[in-house]
Design a protein with these regions (language model features):
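Flavin-dependent oxidoreductase catalytic cores
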Residues: 1-14, 94, 109, 117
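Conserved, mostly hydrophobic/aromatic
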Residues: 34, 121, 125
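Active-site mouth loops of central-metabolism enzymes
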Residues: 13-25, 95-113
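Hydrophobic or amphipathic alpha-helical targeting/insertion segments
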Residues: 31-49
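Hydrophobic faces of well-ordered beta-strands that scaffold small-molecule active sites
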Residues: 13-17, 42-44, 96-100, 122, ...
């Protein structure tokens, strides 16, 4: 569907690439498909835990954290498959954003922890951050200021 929207209407699409529900190999197949379809903008997310789980559990050898998925995308961009072999075609030009939480992620002990992980995501290559739904604008503006103070200089 994303390819149809992008190619027919010339609208840039940003598919969500999740840790949840996918193994590393399945993620690689998705990246290959997106590369073939010339879709290069991604939103990289861990995804939610299953309703019956008390903690997030990855699929098979899938990832626990979005930053691990970022590493796979970064390697893919360099022409390296998940098994370590090199692509015989041109490497991918994926760019991506990540999630952030102005009102604190439900699993985080505090907002400082969320800022720490956001900074790690930025250091790993995130170009922008998209907030999860929030209800208090004041907390959003405080979060943006705290992010800037922590050296996080991407659009939020």
């Amino acid at each position: 569907m994303a390819a149809a929207i992008q190619n027919k209407y010339n609208i840039t699409v940003v598919p969500h690439i999740l840790c949840s529900g996918f193994t590393r190999e399945e993620t690689e197949y998705v990246l290959l498909d997106l590369q073939f379809l010339n879709i290069t903008d991604l939103l990289v997310l861990r995804g939610d835990k299953a309703k019956h789980e008390s903690v997030f559990t990855p699929e098979g050898d899938g990832y626990h954290h979005a930053i691990e998925l970022q590493e796979q995308i970064n390697n893919f961009n360099k022409g390296i498959f998940v098994d370590g072999s090199e692509m015989k075609v041109t490497a991918s030009p994926f760019s991506y954003g990540v999630a952030c939480y102005p009102e604190k992620h439900e699993e985080a002990p505090n907002i400082e922890s969320d800022l720490y992980w956001l900074k790690k995501k930025v250091e790993a290559g995130a170009e922008y951050a998209v907030t999860q739904l929030f209800y208090d604008n004041k907390k959003y503006f405080e979060f943006v200021e705290q992010a800037k103070a922590a050296g996080i200089n991407i659009p939020i």
